């Protein structure tokens, strides 16, 4: 039994890697073939890796720990926010601020400032202040919300981090590694898998591909918290082999 099917991966375009001239040799084991100058990712391995990541994230959630969803590239921003919110988790989808994890105490002070400004807006304080000052405070509040809104209720460091594109989010990964926080990530053919604890080989540039994988990680959290089996799909060996061939033919 697998939590994701080859058909789902194919339909979302998870198998399309980067151009062959833009690759990391460490990803060779996850590459099935090359077609028209583009690497095709081995989806049989992706199915297995999604399983591994899913059960790990589910275990984290069962233990009462949180998962931080991170994806600041345009293709990932909406999915990261939507799936984190759906599963009651935290997210960073605009910009990774240095020290978000390693200097969490200082970040918490900025979050407290955001809460303070929200309270001022709600309790009517803004109404009695000069318009110029209110305008300045609202801009400050908007900037804080944009960068910290996804973690404003995070009281402690997460138990794991789910990342889209380790190359772009390298600072986030380095902070997580420094603190011993396990990293699950969608890793495309141009990335270094050695920096990730749970590699999910796949296309990190297609919105549908990112949405599919992020949704599975959110499902894992929900299942871990609720004890519900949300998504199990039987995958037969023959079917996997057949669909892998379809992926190659589709790329031609």
Swiss-Prot record:
Molecular functions per Gene Ontology: structural constituent of ribosome
Superkingdom of the organism of origin: Bacteria
Source organism (scientific name): Ruminiclostridium cellulolyticum (strain ATCC 35319 / DSM 5812 / JCM 6584 / H10) (Clostridium cellulolyticum)
Pfam families per the UniProt record, alphabetical: Ribosomal_S2
HAMAP family: Ribosomal_uS2_B (MF_00291_B)
Keywords, sorted A to Z: Ribonucleoprotein, Ribosomal protein
GO cellular component, one term: cytosolic small ribosomal subunit
Name of the protein this chain belongs to: Small ribosomal subunit protein uS2
Keyword Ribosomal protein: yes
Protein family per UniProt: Belongs to the universal ribosomal protein uS2 family.
Gene3D superfamilies: Glucose-6-phosphate isomerase like protein, domain 1, Helix hairpin bin
GO BP field: translation
InterPro entries associated with the record: Ribosomal_uS2 (IPR001865), Ribosomal_uS2_bac/mit/plastid (IPR005706), Ribosomal_uS2_CS (IPR018130), Ribosomal_uS2_flav_dom_sf (IPR023591)
Gene name of the record: rpsB
